[in-house]
Structure formats: structure tokens, C-alpha cells
């Protein structure tokens, strides 16, 4: 019963805040707010240049492997649990899926910086 009440309150608050943010007028919109900020100086060129898709993909790959490290760091403490076989199986599957993804990226030249 408590979980349902908390869920209802959270949903109501979220919807209320979204509604208020949507209906409030946007005040003080002028060109200076839309411009780029370069340490107080006027920008020398356009700051809205698109960046390379390769850079984006390498960044996403880095984030995935960073997440892998955070998932594998508590593994030595998990080995002290009663079900060591299941822990090893799950960690092996995680590393295997990520290794297969890395091999796929490597064979399709997704990790090369130059085109």
C-alpha cells in the first residue's frame, strides 16, 4: 500500500512540474542568450559547427566500456556469496558480449579516427 501511495505522489509531482514548466512563458529571450560563450569574448567563428560522427561513436564506445568496469569492480566481493557459479557465469557473459561488440566495431572500422 505504501509503495502505491509513493508511486502516485511521485507521478503526480512529476506531471505537475512538467505541466508548470510547459505553460510558463519563456522570459528574457534575446540573441545574447542564444549565442556561444567564450570566456567573455565574442566568438571568432560559429560555435554551432557539427562534430564528427566518428567522434560520437568512439565516445559512446568509451562510455560502454566505462560502464563495464563499474559493473565488474564489485566482482571480488561478489565471489564471497553462496552462488559463485552464477556470479562467474553472469560476469563471463557480460565480458563476452562486450568483447563481441568490440570485435564488431573493430572489423567494421568503427574505431578508426580518420575516414
From Swiss-Prot:
One Pfam family here: Oxidored_q4
MF annotations from Gene Ontology: NADH dehydrogenase (ubiquinone) activity
Localization terms from the record: Mitochondrion inner membrane
Biological process terms in GO annotation: mitochondrial electron transport, NADH to ubiquinone
EC number from the UniProt entry: 7.1.1.2
Topology term for the membrane: Multi-pass membrane protein
Record InterPro entries: NADH_UbQ/plastoQ_OxRdtase_su3 (IPR000440), NDAH_ubi_oxred_su3_sf (IPR038430)
PANTHER family: NADH-UBIQUINONE OXIDOREDUCTASE CHAIN 3
Cited function: Core subunit of the mitochondrial membrane respiratory chain NADH dehydrogenase (Complex I) which catalyzes electron transfer from NADH through the respiratory chain, using ubiquinone as an electron acceptor. Essential for the catalytic activity of complex I.
Family: Belongs to the complex I subunit 3 family.
Subunit description: Core subunit of respiratory chain NADH dehydrogenase (Complex I) which is composed of 45 different subunits. Interacts with TMEM186. Interacts with TMEM242.
Protein name per its UniProtKB record: NADH-ubiquinone oxidoreductase chain 3
Species classification: Eukaryota, Metazoa, Chordata, Craniata, Vertebrata
